[in-house]
Amino acid sequence: MSRSTVLGWCTQSCRLLQKHDHSFSFPTFNGSPPLKKRRFCDSAAPAAPRPSIHRPSEYIPHSKSGGEAPQDLGHKAREKEAEKEFYLSLLCSASTKREAKSYLSRFKAQKTTANDGCQHITPRRGDLISDLELMKDKPGVNLGSMFSETRTVAETPAPKQEWSSAQSTELFREKIHVALVKLRKPQLLDDQTLHGVAKTLVQLSRLGMSCCIVIDVGTDKDETHRRIIAREQADRLSAVIDANHGPDSRQLDSIITVPSATDMKLSVLSRGPLLSPLQQGHVVVVVPVGYANDTQRAVLLPANEVVFALSKELAGLELRSGPDEDATTTANKVNDMQKQVSLDRIIILDPAGGIPSLQRRPHVFINLEQEFEDIARELSLGSQTGFLSINDSGTASHKMPVSSLGKSNPISIFVEEELVSLPKTLGESQEMPRNGKRFAEHLENLNLLQRTLSYLPPSSSGIIVTPHEVALSAKGPLNTSAVSAVRTRRQRNPLIHNLLTDKPFQSASLPLGRLGVKSDCMSAGQSPATHSTFVKRGMPLTMLPDPRVEVWAAKKRGEPALTLDDPRIDLPRLIHLIEDSFGRKLDARHYVDRINPRLAGLIIAGEYEGGAVLTWETPPGLSDDGSEEFRARMVPYLDKFAVLKRSQGAGGVADIVFNAMVRTCFPQGVCWRSRANNPVNKWYFERSRGTWKLPGTNWTMFWTTAGVPENQSRFWDYEGVCRAIEPSWADKTQQAD
């Protein structure tokens, strides 16, 4: 199967794929037995009974919505229906071939060889990754080798061998990709919603992302009552997962230990029982109950602390070493542990939804490196004040002041100039929570993601979304009349979309008008943006000059101005960034000489992973007489917008830079040009206020300034500048304009 065929999977029609179960025997885990009174609901041996869980053989939620398997179908028919729903959801969640290629590179099968004659073990990693193969004589989705090993390897019987501590690392030779999920207050979810959540988690597991779910029942009742609720909801979730015709669930309710009931320094009792079911492709459900070492009694633990302890264990940071162990041995142990697991996602399923902004819509994307302190301060103030209502008249009760970073934060909030008319535009009254408890919950979620992601690699990310949104997108489209057979469009699942793309559900740099505000959302008083928040540890953002200190404005004659020779600018890295992004060699001397007299500022993301060079351009025919009228007509121009090729399409680098430009540096507007055949133009179209194809040229002009078509003088100034810019490429060749 060619790689082009594999990467074209998302454009093929969806057909059922036959599933073949291969028998597999997994070694029994005999190491680190639990202490007295410590009970593991799961043994590493798949055949071991689970006495603490009793569930019906088939769990079918009471739902009349379309897209669910009819209840009168047999077991095989429901399996086929679930299979079809899985591929439909998968195909609808994919976006581009580049994103599919990125997903393949992150989740490709790892080739390994046995060490020291030890027989290699190929554990089962879920139906999709190891069991699916193309059936030419029956309808199927041609995924080629996208999710599976070669046919010879897949059909080779897996050898049986007993577990020994010396061979423990052999079991986890293939790296496990894990999503650590916190499900908040599942007792408030109806069966239909919980079924949709479970279906999505099963689909994530089949796509190679093993799920470990921590139950969070809240703090509304006493400890004894909450412990009972936690166990009941864990059983309930496990039953729904098992009814989804995918990977089975495995419930663990005593893998966490604490020194005492008053010392909440949590740690994982044993690594093996946690990784073993994940390696086998099971969905792990963790009850937040641990045992105190001093009393050997069960203690209900804070769910956030359980998530944090599990994240450190999965990241290989909880090292158990003896006092006489040398540093080399310890380092090798840490290295081996980190090769076993890749903790890729921290998922918070909370009815409260994404992180809100007290001034505007919920945050779509948070760059923790740049925004955490500002957003945490804002939420802390909200938890103290408790209520914010912005009505049609523009008045607000308990309105929160803009934080110290305010408009200088590129992703935190929309600047006042751009979205001040939002409530009037939507014709609605936008209300925030009526007490501070909801803001405190959001702050807890943000703090949890900040703590966990600070320990994880930069590639790891977090997402906060409501269970209802996940469940709604997990449904099939509603059937209409049987005559027309017209069906509504299937919604993209935010978790599957995030897995495939490693991006937020909506781009953080999209203007509000591009978000597709629906009438039903307007009437319900909901935010037009999706109520989910994508969180990355991210990267620092440098803006020169700093807008918090100096507003970006055209300089008067004789005033000192920023140049590319400034010692704060790493010119060789900037030139490399531009050349790598455009794929062309830059005439560096010509470029520096052209930019220096007119440089407005520079935006740099991370270690020159992305950036923008902005200038003040003089309209043709206008001479600098030093007057205010001349400075007022200077055109803010985006000369170069560049992202390293390895960072394009992932990590939100482009969004970070673009938001800084249009919301912080030039909130009143900026213009730029792009060749008419530039594939990035679609991205520009979505984020600009207007475009104009320059007659007689191969250029398209874009702007974010308000009222450009109505202001003819400004329009012709913009067009004149875009026509007159002289390129600085070393090859001296360019397309005919």
Curated annotation (Swiss-Prot):
Write down the InterPro entries for this protein, in alphabetical order.
AceGlu_kinase-like_sf, GlcNAc_Synth_fun, Vertebrate-like_GNAT_dom
Q: Which reaction does it catalyse?
A: L-glutamate + acetyl-CoA = N-acetyl-L-glutamate + CoA + H(+)
Where is it localised?
Mitochondrion
Q: Name one GO cellular component term.
A: mitochondrial matrix
For this entry, list what GO says about its biological process: L-arginine biosynthetic process; ornithine biosynthetic process
- Record-level Gene Ontology MF annotations: L-glutamate N-acetyltransferase activity
Which Pfam families does this entry report, sorted A to Z?
Answer: NAT
Report the transit peptide positions.
1-47
The annotated region (Disordered) lies at 43-78
Q: Tell me which residues make up the N-acetyltransferase domain.
A: 558-727
Predominant localisation class: mitochondrion
- EC numbers listed for it are 2.3.1.1
Q: In which pathway does it act?
A: Amino-acid biosynthesis; L-arginine biosynthesis; N(2)-acetyl-L-ornithine from L-glutamate: step 1/4
Q: Which UniProt keywords apply?
A: Acyltransferase, Amino-acid biosynthesis, Mitochondrion, Transferase, Transit peptide
Family that this chain belongs to: Belongs to the acetyltransferase family.
Q: What does this protein do?
A: N-acetylglutamate synthase involved in arginine biosynthesis.
What is the protein named?
A: Amino-acid acetyltransferase, mitochondrial
What is the source species?
Coccidioides immitis (strain RS)
Give the lineage.
Eukaryota, Fungi, Dikarya, Ascomycota, Pezizomycotina
Q: What gene is behind this protein?
A: ARG2
